[in-house]
Amino acid sequence: GRINQYRVVEAVKLWRKMLTRLFETGHPWITFKDPANIRSPQDHDGVVHNSNLCTEITLNNSDTETAVCNLGSVNLSRHVTAEGVDHELLSRTVSTAMRMLDNVIDINFYPTEEARRSNMRHRPVGLGLMGFQDALFKLRHPFDSRGAQAFADEIMEFISYHAILASSKLAAERGAYESFPGSKWDRGIFPLDTLDLLEAERGVEIPVPRTTRMDWTPVREHVARHGMRNSNTMAVAPTATISNIAGSYPCIEPIYKNIYVKSNMSGEFTVINEYLVNDLKARGLWNQEMLEELKAHDGDVGRIDAVPAELKELYKEAFEIDATRLVQLTALRGKWIDQSQSHNVFMKGVSGKKLEEIYMAAWELGLKTTYYLRSLGASQIEKSTLDAKKYGYTQKREAAAPKPAVAAGSGAESALSGGSNGNGTGAAGSAGDAATGERPTRIAATAVTTDAGFAASIANMSSATEITNICSLDDPDCEACQ
């Protein structure tokens, strides 16, 4: 008889199971097929069936072609000072990197003919960035501020502008890639334009602003005249290893911990955020007692009374930042990128409703892919070098404080959208406001969901076992979450 290779399942039940497995294991890495394909420059020549392991590559695959992408990353920490971005240096770096990556295509080793064929026909490259957190530290922008949103938008537009222009200049010098005719580039459709295509396909608004700071007319005219050397130009990889070598923070992520223990063949040693140390020294606050406080509170400066409010805002760790705010930053960068970004989700609590809110916000804002879900355990290694009488026992983490519900469109929501400026105050600085306009408010509006959401889906489950698994997500005291 005929074997059915599929079965019909209820979408809501499948979604619940996906979120449960995600919370339990950090997998699966949720990828959205509609933006990955609708926004692909190569929609005329195949289908994006999957991403790569780190979820930043969205290229076509088939039985005759295996997608291959050569990657490189711009170290923002080398292009940003307290005075701002060195745009001249950054433009040269991007142009040099694009030429380098195009050269790699020709001299690379290909394990299969399918891989060689794909790379030679389409010549995709993935230029990304790292040291985003370094740049924000230097510019004094907290990660969840309007200034950070404005910077994410501005810096990615600049990199996109010069990456696309560099590829087109290479096309004028070396010729356009083989499958260029019929591509979005050939039709005059750039990454920013594809948000409108996605919006039209879904029939709902993609609440990401389409504003630009640069004059794109020369780039569009150059591409129309000479074509593109590379089918794809940008992708933000995790850069965990190369950023460590370069001495910067990885890719687009906030600082994981202000203090941690690093291990290598030479042994173990304590690493402390040098930006934080320098700021504390400048204020006369860096001493042995402050070091002990940092150790006791696992690097969370928000729990140290002696640290000024400005520094508490600037040096928030990844788990102290609302995950939906990080999604918003990725959406602002993503509108300029023709592939995707390795976006890790950091969640401090154990709320199933919050987990759904984060991933629904990612879809609504048009993200193509997500990477690991990273969560904090309820316990940690006991800090035996600290005075237990003074600091108490340090093996159990404090539960995340619940946040008050915010009605959509309320003044409180607008304040959340703006976050804080570089001075640690609640209002955004005038420069950030002028640069962003209504951007943060529009984006933040998508992160507000009804209380019914995930909680209602739990109530409707028919399996007692499934109910137990899901309910544990909302129970901080559940042993399964320890």
Predicted regions and their residues:
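Internal maturation/activation junctions in enzymes
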Residues: T93-R116, P142-T239, A309-E313, Q341-S342, ...
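Function-dense linear segments that define catalytic or interfacial modules
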Residues: L22-N119, P124, G131-L139, S248-Y275, ...
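Acidic, low-complexity intrinsically disordered tails
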Residues: S384-Q482
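A glycine-rich phosphate-binding loop feature that marks nucleotide/adenosyl-phosphate handling sites
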Residues: F32-D43, E114-V125, Q149-E154, K169-L197, ...
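Catalytic alpha/beta core of large soluble enzyme barrels
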Residues: T58-N60, L101-D106, A176, P209-R213, ...
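Polar, glycine-rich mid-to-C-terminal structural blocks
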Residues: G1-T25
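Structured core elements
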Residues: E24, W29-F32, N70-N75, P124-G126, ...
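Alpha-helix capping and helix-loop boundary segments enriched in small/acidic/polar residues
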Residues: Q5-V9, Q42-D45, T58-D63, T81-R92, ...
